[in-house]
Amino acid sequence: YQMLPSWEEVSASKRAFAESFAIQYRNNEWIQGQRLVERYDDRLCIVQNPPQEPLSTEELDEIYELPYEGTYHPMYEAAGGVPAIREVEFSIVSNRGCFGGCAFCALTYHQGREVRSRSRESIVREAERLTRRPGFKGYIHDVGGPTANFRAPACEEQLARGVCKHRDCLYPRPCKRMKIDHSDYLGVLRAVRGLPGVKKVFIRSGIRFDYLMADAAHGEFMEELCRYHVSGTLKVAPEHCAARVLSRMRKPDISVFEAFRKEYQKTNRKLSVKQYIIPYFISSHPGSTLSDAVELALFLKQTGFVPDQVQDFYPTPGTLATCEYYTERDPFTGAPVYVAKTMEEKK
């Protein structure tokens, strides 16, 4: 086991808080992760066991094929139902886990970095059930997960020895050991959209564009994406354009997004369609300064993007970015990190 700084220490010291986060971050893994112990005064300790092994394909199939009702509880009828159900009632979960490694995202803690997926047959069976559900009009809103185009563990090393502690899979660039392949996901999408009663299959859970562009055969996926799975706009998440901020976010250089955008437009011309990209951006992320905000504004002006909304960073439990927001330091190096906290700084 490994001792964390005590509750009293992390409560009194931001440096101890950052140290505790770094230890937890490196041990959030089922093969190599150690049992973590945090002392709470002189009476007791809190013990956190390593995560369990991610569910297998067979286990995921069994769980997702249980006879769920697929709607809200009748107790909500008196209040008019739950409007948000419309966003997910005709969506299909195909995978769990994410090796994307974004600093502002807690999915690594919820589901782990090792991706596990349902079988194609299980997904098709669920899609068939959706076509028989009341209210189905021929549109499946999503076939995806934390990241839609992740269908397998990043590499063989990950399966044998666990995820790497010294580097991320995609940041600062895709690891050379990574198995990059969209053929399985393409097969799933083809099978679902070929079902009787299915008019269109959308992808709403997000395409990781740097992973797609690293695939030597990305043209095939891009063409089918534009031809069959985009309603008119595709939402992707470059998050910023300034290299310093992207580094803090653990996101790829903006040149990767630009290459993706050009490929997307090229595919549109080939198919004689007019589809748009809606890029997501985050303002005042830890490490983002006024000059970085100006750089982003100029980028938007030069590219012609007119965002109708911008997400201002807000701290959420369990993320690297939130640790930096609170401690104002990098938990792995101890280096100071600028954080815009006041309304004046954010504006």
Predicted features, each with a name:
Residues 105-122:
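Iron-sulfur (Fe-S) cluster-binding segments and ferredoxin-like electron-carrier domains
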Residues 53-55, 63, 154-183, 247-249, ...:
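Radical SAM enzyme [4Fe-4S]-AdoMet core and its adjacent flexible, acidic
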Residues 63, 98, 123, 236, ...:
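Conserved, mostly hydrophobic/aromatic
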